[in-house]
Amino acid sequence: MPDSLITKRALASSLKELMKTQPLTKISVGDICEKCGMNRKSFYYHFCDKYDLVNWIFDTEFSEIRNRPDHITKFEEICEYFYADREFYRNALQITGQNSFRDYFRMQIQPILKELVGNLFDSEEDTEFLVTFLADGMVSALIRWLNGSDPEPPEEMARRVRRTMVAISQAIVTTYEEEESKAGKE
C-alpha cells in the first residue's frame, strides 16, 4: 500500500473516531492530526479541509458499490453501508453549505438516479428536474432515517425508498402525459 494511502487512511480513521464523540463542526484539522500523530502539513498535502476528507472517506468506502454495473439494484447495500457507519454519516450529513457531504452525496447519486429514470420525458430539463427532485428527497429521507433514535433495518429503508421513487415517478409520468395530451387537443 502506498505511503499516501496509509496517511489518508490514518487521517480518515482519526476523523471517524473523533466524530463518534463530537460534531464535525467542533473538530479541527489540528484535532485530526493530533489523534493520529501527524502534522497539519501532511493533512493539507492530501486534503483541502476536513470536508474534503469526509468526501474522500465516502468515495473510498462507497466506490465498490457505486462502480459495479448492477449498482442500481443494490440500493439495499447502500442503506447497509450507511447504517453500518451511521454515527459517522449522521454527523457528516448535518453539515450544510460549501463543501458539505450532503451536497457531495447528492451529486454522487444523481448519475445513478438519471440512469434509473432514463428517458421518461422528451425534455432534458424535465428529466434533470426529476433527478434533482429524487436526489433531494433521497438525501432528506436518509438524514431522517439515520437521525432516528431506532432506525429501521437497512433492507426496510431500501424497500421504502424504492417503492416511493417508483410511485413518484409513475405519478409524474402519468401527469405529464395527461398534460401533453390536453395541450395537443387545444
Provide a role label for each language-model segment.
Residues 1-22, 31:
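Basic, helix-initiating cap at the start of DNA-binding domains
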Residues 11, 30-35, 43, 82:
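Append "Primarily bacterial transcriptional regulators
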Residues 20-24, 37-54:
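HTH DNA-binding helix-turn interface
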Residues 28-29, 58-69:
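Short, basic, alpha-helical segments at the C-terminal edge of helix-turn-helix-like DNA-binding modules
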Residues 66-91, 98:
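Hydrophobic alpha-helical connector segments
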Residues 97-140, 163-166, 170:
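Amphipathic alpha-helical packing segments from all-alpha helical-bundle domains
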Residues 147-186:
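C-terminal peripheral helix-coil segments that are non-catalytic and often amphipathic
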